[in-house]
Design a protein with these regions (language model features):
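Positively charged, low-complexity intrinsically disordered leader regions
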Residues: 1-57, 61
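Anion-binding alpha/beta catalytic cores of soluble intermediary-metabolism enzymes, centered on
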Residues: 98-169, 261
Length: 307
């Protein structure tokens, strides 16, 4: 049965938990020099409308480790929705590859691809959400805290696709999620209410970074202006200046709290050099875990496809 990974909401709580366990197994096997050829003779089409370092490397390396092949296409190679319709591209690609992976601006494009493709579609990032990243984050949290349930997470800064990803996750895994941002950059409060109504997580939105961080086990941030928002940088730096993760703010968190950032980071803006390089920072563990979580996602989708 063909299934996709476009949002965390596409999978159940059990499926998410099982996949994290599987990712941990794959990570351990990799460290032992074992790479089970679970994607042998499988080919994946990787589409990039946005520049990429971690996403491209982690997917290409992961697919290769498991015996598969990657075909990478940039925006210069194809014009989905311009030269050809999304539906035509999806149906043609489905005849060539075993999975379509896309990193783009438009979330609707990914949904349209999934609607018409007969092979799994994976959202490598859109302006709306970033499910592979939040899965990697949860593996990192589990490694450091020993569990993922009811973790006290303080998300500090701009409300963006990562904020939405964390809110979606809170609909599947019980979290104590605190979002601290400026009045000008508040998240979609309708979505916040919908997640709260599900009733498994506690969600709080505040304009005080200190309030969000008090007693937190995880401090999380992202860039203040996402890719394609260069015109908003000056405004964001002004309104979000009090939402920087620095050593002063870190003091309000739990003593052994971990600091997370999905990268790339604008050091000195949303997070200081001192904090990103401190002993509590797990930023580069997050980056590594993209590799193993994404391998687990692709293997699971292939298993479902052949059932």
């Amino acid at each position: 049965m063909k299934r996709d990974f476009i949002s965390i909401l596409d999978w159940t709580s059990k499926e998410i938990r099982d996949n994290l366990d599987f990712a941990a197994e794959l990570k351990q096997q990799t460290k032992e020099g074992k790479c089970p050829q679970l994607l042998k003779r499988k080919t994946y089409g990787l589409f990039f409308h946005k520049p990429s370092l971690r996403t491209r490397l982690s997917f290409e390396v992961g697919i290769a480790q498991l015996g598969g092949t990657s075909l990478v296409l940039s925006e210069q190679d194809f014009k989905i929705g311009e030269r050809e319709t999304v539906s035509d591209v999806a149906r043609v690609m489905s005849r060539y590859v075993d999975g379509i992976l896309i990193r783009t601006f438009s979330h609707q494009m990914v949904l349209d691809l999934a609607q018409h493709a007969t092979v799994p579609v994976v959202n490598m990032l859109t302006d709306f959400n970033h499910p592979c990243q939040v899965m990697s984050d949860m593996l990192t949290i589990k490694e450091n805290l020993g569990h993922i349930d009811n973790v006290r997470i303080a998300y500090i800064g701009d409300s963006n696709n990562m904020t939405i990803s964390w809110l979606n996750l809170a609909a599947r895994i019980p979290l104590d999620l605190r979002i601290a941002t400026a009045p000008e950059t508040m998240p979609d409060m309708k979505l916040v209410s919908e997640i709260q109504e599900i009733g498994i997580s506690t969600i709080k939105v505040t304009n005080s970074a200190q309030e969000a961080v008090e007693g937190a086990e995880v401090l999380y941030t992202d860039v203040w202006a996402s890719m394609g928002e260069k015109d908003k940088i000056a405004e964001r730096e002004l309104v979000l200046k009090d939402f920087q993760i620095n050593s002063s703010l870190l003091k309000y968190a739990e003593k052994n709290a971990i600091v997370m950032h999905c990268l790339p980071a604008e050091r000195g803006k949303e997070i200081t050099d001192e904090v990103i390089e401190c002993a509590q920072s797990v930023v580069f563990d997050q980056a590594e875990n993209r590799l193993h979580v994404q391998k687990a996602i692709l293997v699971q989708l292939e298993k479902w496809r052949t059932v």
